[in-house]
């Protein structure tokens, strides 16, 4: 019997994406410090946070992830408030930016355990936004708990002109890469089980 998969996240988006793969989950959010360290490159940042989340939660098979929007080398995390969301959306307006997600799978099936990870990058082209669009969008409340202050799977998708790479990565979890990591960790996916 396959071990129960523990998701070290409170993200409803990650839960929904994993449900698309037919995976039953136990949700145990990790309590970790998600601040960017001084001088920390964006790839190193998301990988460090995903690993810390996976290590902070007990379980035989733990999956954790961290997503960041990166513009000009700056990590845009979740906005502190509505004004910060407006600032981020103005900065993203009319630009191409990168969405990075690090996924970490930790398995404690042996004395040594196994930790596998991957970082996936997706390029997103954003429409030019005026103040009226930004104010309306911030007023919906949707951007306030999203990295980079937008949700491609929600109303914010209206501002996305082009995506190069994994769309599920922009939502918060690259499904193809996550499935590959689970397989490598010895976790059979629903269609691989007898």
Swiss-Prot record:
State what protein this is by name: dTTP/UTP pyrophosphatase
Subcellular location(s): the record lists: Cytoplasm
Name its co-factor(s).
Answer: a divalent metal cation
Q: Name the job this protein performs.
A: Nucleoside triphosphate pyrophosphatase that hydrolyzes dTTP and UTP. May have a dual role in cell division arrest and in preventing the incorporation of modified nucleotides into cellular nucleic acids.
Stated family: Belongs to the Maf family. YhdE subfamily.
Tell me its EC number(s), please.
3.6.1.9
Report the SS bond pairs: none
> What main location does UniProt list?
cytoplasm
Single Gene Ontology BP annotation: nucleotide metabolic process
Q: Which reaction does it catalyse?
A: dTTP + H2O = dTMP + diphosphate + H(+); UTP + H2O = UMP + diphosphate + H(+)
Q: Name one Pfam family in it.
A: Maf
Q: What residues correspond to the site Important for substrate specificity?
A: 13, 67, 153
Keyword annotations for this protein, in alphabetical order, are: Cytoplasm, Hydrolase, Nucleotide metabolism
Species source reads Anaeromyxobacter dehalogenans (strain 2CP-1 / ATCC BAA-258)
- Catalytic residues of the enzyme: 66
Give the enzyme class.
hydrolase
**Gene Ontology molecular-function annotations:** dTTP diphosphatase activity; UTP diphosphatase activity
A GO CC annotation given for this chain = cytoplasm
Which InterPro entries does the entry link to? Answer: ITPase-like_fam, Maf-like
């Amino acid at each position: 019997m396959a071990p129960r998969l523990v998701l070290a996240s409170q993200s409803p988006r990650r839960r929904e994406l994993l449900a698309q793969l037919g995976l039953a989950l136990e949700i145990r959010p990790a309590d970790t410090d998600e601040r960017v360290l001084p001088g920390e490159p964006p790839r190193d940042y998301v990988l460090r946070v995903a690993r810390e989340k996976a290590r902070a939660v007990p379980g035989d098979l733990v999956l954790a992830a961290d997503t960041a929007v990166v513009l000009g080398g700056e990590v845009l995390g979740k906005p502190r408030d509505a004004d910060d969301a407006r600032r981020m959306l103005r900065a993203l307006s009319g630009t191409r930016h990168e969405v990075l997600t690090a996924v970490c799978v930790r398995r404690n099936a042996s004395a040594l355990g196994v930790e596998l990870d991957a970082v996936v990058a997706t390029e997103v082209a954003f429409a030019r936004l005026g103040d009226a669009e930004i104010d309306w969008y911030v007023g919906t409340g949707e951007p306030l708990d999203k990295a980079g202050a937008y949700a491609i799977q929600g109303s914010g998708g209206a501002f996305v002109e082009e995506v190069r790479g994994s769309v599920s990565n922009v939502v918060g979890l690259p499904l193809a890469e996550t499935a590959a990591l689970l397989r490598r960790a010895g976790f059979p996916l629903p269609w691989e089980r007898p």
